[in-house]
Amino acid sequence: MKIIYVSVFSIWLVLGLVLTAGAQNKVPNITFNHSNVFDRTCSDTLKKPISPESLAELDRIVPRLRTRWETDGPKLLKTTAAIVGRPWAFSEWKYAMFLCDGFHSMSFPPLLDMKTFVPSTSKGEPESDEVFIAVIFHELLHIYVDDCLEGAPNGTTKFLEKYKAESSTVKNHLHLFAVEKLVYTKLRMEKYLKDTIISEKKLSPGPSFTRAREIVDLETPETFVRELMLGGK
């Protein structure tokens, strides 16, 4: 039965690659800049100064990170659309990079917390460029998954209902982690996933992320991606 299911999914994936060949090449243009205004206003409001050294360090690494995204970003987004069979619903997204304490990266409003990537503000060794790319991809996938499931009956799916007792953090990452794993595997970018998982363990929601990945592995990533293909139906 499992062999049959995998075969059906494989056929569906091939059809998706063909039918969305045009759409998958149209990926959103993603840009990011250090928001000095955000950092200044935030630090003044919270009474938590940011050193000029840290701000200068962030500005120095931005060009390198842009170059890295230009190399890795488009193929991650194209492969996502190809695997799921649904195009990205927006054409552009702009992120504000910041160092102010008290906020974290999020999909909306589009914010990138850079404290762990800057030597003077990271607690220990700064995170790698691979983790930076993974953070952007992660936040974009939140929007993509939400768009795919927008028409789900009663706002849920079979597997979200099955795991309704789990925390919202776990449920909000099931489909995301499924797509993430298939995309990184398809592109042979497993190091990005490995580094991301290590980085996640340092965060307060780390246990919830671990639990979500356990569920995805148990049910298989293809199971959750199929729900995205069907719009949650």
Predicted regions located by residue number:
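Boundary at the C-terminal end of the N-terminal hydrophobic targeting segment
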Residues: 21-23
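Active-site scaffold of zinc-dependent metalloenzymes
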Residues: 94-134, 146
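Post-HExxH zinc-binding segment in Zn-dependent metallohydrolases
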Residues: 148-149, 156-204
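Auxiliary, metal-adjacent structural segments of Zn-dependent hydrolase domains
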Residues: 52-110, 170, 185-187
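Pan-zinc metallopeptidase signature
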Residues: 193-233
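Second-shell loop/turn segments in exported
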Residues: 61-70, 122-126, 159-167
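Acidic/histidine-rich, surface-exposed loop or edge segments in extracytoplasmic proteins
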Residues: 28, 34-66
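Bacterial N-terminal signal peptides
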Residues: 7-18
